[in-house]
Amino acid sequence: MKGNQEEYRLKFFLDHDYLRRECKVCKTPFWSKDKTREDCADIPCSDYYFLDMKESNLNWSVSEARRRFLDFFRRNGHEIIPPKPVLARWREDLYLTIASIVDFQPYITSGISPPPANPLVVSQPCIRMDDVDNVGITFGRHLTTFEMGGHHAFNYPDKFLYWKDETVAYAKEFFTKEMGIPEELLNFKESWWEGGGNAGPSFEVTVGGLELATLVFMQYEIRDGEYVPLKLKIVDTGYGIERLAWFTQKTPTAFHAIYGELVDKFLEKLGLPSLNPDMLKVASRFAGRIDPDVPSTIQGHREQVAKAMGLPVKEVSEELTRAARVFQVLDHTKTIALMLGDGLVPSSGGEGYLGRLLIRRALRTLKLLNVDVRLSELVDMQIGFWGKDFTQLVRNRDYILDAVNLEQEKFNEILNRMSSVVSSLTKKKEIGVEDLIQLYDSQGIPPDLMAEEMRSKGLKVEVPHNFYSIVAKRHQSAPVKKEWDTTKLPPEVVKQVKDLPPTEKLYYKDQYARNFEGVIVKSLGKYLVLDRTVFYPEGGGQLGDQGWLLLDGQRVKVVDTQKVGDVVVHVLEREISAKEGDKVKGEIDWVRRFRMMRHHTGTHVVLAAAKKLLGDHVWQAGAEKTPEKARLDITHHRNLTREEVKRIEEMANLVVDDRRPVTPFEINRTEAETKYGVSIYEGGVPNKAVIRLLEIKDWDVESCGGTHVANTADIGGIKIVNVEKIQDGIIRLEYVAGDVISSYAGNLEDKLEGLASKLETSTSQIESRVEKLKEENERMKELIAFYRRQYLDDLEKHVETRNVGKVKIVILPSLKDEDLEREAMRRLTSTQGVVVIHVNQVNGKLQIEIGTSKDLNVSTVVTELVKAGGKGGGRGTFGSVMIEKGTKEEVIDIVERAIKGGNS
C-alpha cells in the first residue's frame, strides 16, 4: 500500500534493466533505463526539452493521435467503445465527465454491473474546470477540455486479465513502437492515486519534461482511513491525446498542435496580429517553471523569456499576455461547443452554471482583448473544425449558436448595469472574496471587469488570480441524498423498516391490478408493511396510492404510500391494532391511480415530443404526476412560443392516436446504456444493477419505476394547460390527460360564462365585446391625455412660486396621481434656474420630493433637509427625503435657506 516500495518493483523493470532512481529535485523515485538521468523528466524538475528532441519525427494531429492510440490497443485485444457525453448524466453526484474512469463509476467499478467490454479502450472527451484560470498562461499544460485515452481492465477474482507489468509493457510498446521514442528516454515516475473512495499505486510516464500518460492501479478501498484491498482490481490509464499530438508536432505551444490552422483563423477573426512563434516556443520550453498559484513565478518566467530572446521584459509580457488570452478563447470556445453539443443549457444552477461561467469568462476575455466579435462566430469555427470528430456539434449547431448568442445578450445587459451595481457598494470600504463570489452569482459581473471601477470609487478590492476556479469548484458536484432522506415517513419509522425484507411489488406484475391479499410484516400504529402489495409508493414524481385495507372486519383508509429502499409502507388514516402474520385484503382507489398512470405515461410522451421538436438539449429537470394534472420541467434556453406549445401537444396526441404499445422491461444497466445511451436517465439514475425501462414503441425509451398504461390509446388525449418559465433555463409544462380533460374543459366553460356575465354579453360574443371595450379604452386614454395636458398648462400658470435670487422655487401641490406629478415635475424643471418641491403627508410623516433644472444640483437642498432630521438622499436633479415631524412651510423655509447658502 501507500509508501510500500514493493508496489512499484515490477518484474518488467527488473527484466528490462530499468533502474530505480530518485529525482534530485523533487526526491520522487522513478524507473528509467538511462543510467545518467538525475531528474524525473517532469515539470518543474525539468523544462520542456522534448520541443528540441529529434528522436520522434511524427506529425500527429489530435485526430491522428486518437486513431493511433485506439488502434494500438485494438490490435492488442482491447475492444474500442464509444465515448460518453461530457455531461456525466449517469452520475447523480457529478456534473461533468472529468476522466475516462468516470464512464464506469460507480456501478462497474464497484462490481455491481459488468463493463461493456473487458478489456476495453476509449478516447473520452473530458472537461475540468478546476484550473480554468490557468488556461493559456501555461501554454498548454492546463486545458478545460481534453481527451483522455484510457485502456481499462477489470480484474475479477475468477477472471484476471492483466495488471501492473502488462500495463507498463503496453506503455513501453506504444511509446517506442508507435511513436518512435527511444526506450532510454522513457521514465516511469512513482506516484499514488486516490479518488472516489478508491486508491492505488500509479506511474506517471514522462518524456522530455512532458507527462504523456498516467497508469493507475485501483486496488484499495479507503474505509475509515484504512486501505482495504478490493476484490475487483482495475487498470485505469490516462493517455493525454492532445499531449501525444504536441509531442509529435513540437509546435510552439500545445494550442498550435491542438487547433492547427484555427489559431491563425481566430487571430484573423479577432483582428489581431500574428503571434511570435519563436517567443512562444521559448515561453513553452520554460513553462513548467510557472506555478499559477504563485504569481511571482509568472513574472519570473517572462523575465527568463526576455533574457533568452534579448528583448525588454515589458514587450515580452505584453505579447505573452495577448497570446494567453487568445489561447483562452480557443480553449473555452471548444469546451462551450462540447458542453452545449451534449445538451447543456446555460443557467444559474447545476451543470448550466458551469456552462454559463465558461461563456462569461470567454466574453470577459474578448473584452480584455478589446475586440468586437460575437462569441457565437468563434464557437461556429470550432464546430466546423471538430465536427467530423464530434458529430453532435454539427447536429446541434443551431441550438449551440442560438444559446451562445442569447448568453452574450444577457452579458451585455449585465455590463450595462455594472456602474449602478458598483455604486450600491460604496458604503463598503473593502470587498472580499466572498463578496465577489456573491456579486458574480447574483449579478453575473466578472470581478476583474468591475475591479477598476470599484477602485475609482475608493473601494479596496483584490481579485484572486484563481477566482473562476474557486467558483467552479463550489459548483462542480451535486449533493446526493439517500432514498430515505427524501421520504415523508418519520425517522423512527424509517429506522424500524429499512432492514425488512423487500416487499413483493404486485403493481409491476400487473399495473391494472386493483385488489390483492397480503400478510402483515410490520405494524407501527398507522404505518403498515405487508409482504406484498398493489399500492404504488410515491416515487419518480408520481404520488403514492390511496385506497383501503380490510383486516379483522375493519375497513381502514390508506391515505398515502411511501417506500424505504425496497420496503413499501402503507400510511393509514388512523392507528390500528394489528399483529405480524395477520392476513390483509387491499384495494386501491382505481380512479385516482388510473389518472396518475395516464399522466405518467403522458409525461414520457410529452418529454419525447419536446426533445424531438426543440432539440437534444431538452432534458427533464423535474416532474410531478397527480390525479388532477401533471407537470414537466424541461431545460430550454428560451421561452416557448405559442406555436411550439401547440406543436408539442399535436405531436403528443398523434402518439396517443397511434395506439402504440407501452412496455416496461428489466435490463442490465450496462446493456441498457450501450443500447439506448444515457438519455434513459431523464427521470433520474436508479441505484441498481438491473434497471426497469419503459418503452413507448418507436417513440421513447426511459428508465422508470412508475405505473403506466399498456397502450398510448389508454392515455385518452393530452391537453397542455399552462407553460411558464420557472427559472433561468427551465420551462414548466402543465397538462391534463384522459377524463381530466373533460373536467378542465368544464372549468373553462364556467369561467367563460362568468366572464360573459360580467361583460353583459353571451359567450359567443365575448371576443367582439372585448374588442369594443378596447376601442373605448383607447378613446378614454386619448381624452385623459388631452385633459392632463390642459391641466398642466393651467398648473404652470397658477402654481405657487417663490424667488431666491436667480432661482425660482416652485411648490407643487398634491395631484393625487403619481404619473401626473412626475410629468409636472419634468415640465416645471425644463427651464433653467428652477427648484421644484413636492410635499406629501404619508402616515403622519412628510414625504418630500425635490427636482431641479439641469443647471442646478439637488444635493445642497437634500443635505439641509437631512440636517433638519430627514432621511433620504439624491444626486443630480432629483432627491427624496422623509421627515418625521414638521410642516410644509418649514420645509419651504429650509429649501430657501439652502439656496441662499449656496448653489443648489
UniProtKB/Swiss-Prot annotation:
Gene name for this UniProt entry: alaS
Residues bound to Zn(2+): H600, H604, C704, H708
Annotated family: Belongs to the class-II aminoacyl-tRNA synthetase family.
Swiss-Prot/TrEMBL domain comment: Consists of three domains; the N-terminal catalytic domain, the editing domain and the C-terminal C-Ala domain. The editing domain removes incorrectly charged amino acids, while the C-Ala domain, along with tRNA(Ala), serves as a bridge to cooperatively bring together the editing and aminoacylation centers thus stimulating deacylation of misacylated tRNAs.
Alphabetical list of Pfam families matching this protein: DHHA1, tRNA-synt_2c, tRNA_SAD
Stated name of the protein: Alanine--tRNA ligase
Function (record text): Catalyzes the attachment of alanine to tRNA(Ala) in a two-step reaction: alanine is first activated by ATP to form Ala-AMP and then transferred to the acceptor end of tRNA(Ala). Also edits incorrectly charged Ser-tRNA(Ala) and Gly-tRNA(Ala) via its editing domain.
Swiss-Prot/TrEMBL cofactor(s): Zn(2+)
Organism domain of life: Archaea
Keywords: Aminoacyl-tRNA synthetase, ATP-binding, Cytoplasm, Ligase, Metal-binding, Nucleotide-binding, Protein biosynthesis, RNA-binding, tRNA-binding, Zinc
EC assignment: 6.1.1.7
Organism: Metallosphaera sedula (strain ATCC 51363 / DSM 5348 / JCM 9185 / NBRC 15509 / TH2)
Cofactor stoichiometry and binding remark: Binds 1 zinc ion per subunit.
Annotated catalysed reactions: tRNA(Ala) + L-alanine + ATP = L-alanyl-tRNA(Ala) + AMP + diphosphate
NCBIfam families, A to Z: A-tRNA_syn_arch, alaS
Gene Ontology terms for molecular function: alanine-tRNA ligase activity; aminoacyl-tRNA deacylase activity; ATP binding; tRNA binding; zinc ion binding
Keyword Cytoplasm on entry: yes
Xref: Gene3D superfamilies: 2.40.30.130, 3.30.54.20, Bira Bifunctional Protein, Domain 2, Threonyl-trna Synthetase, Chain A, domain 2
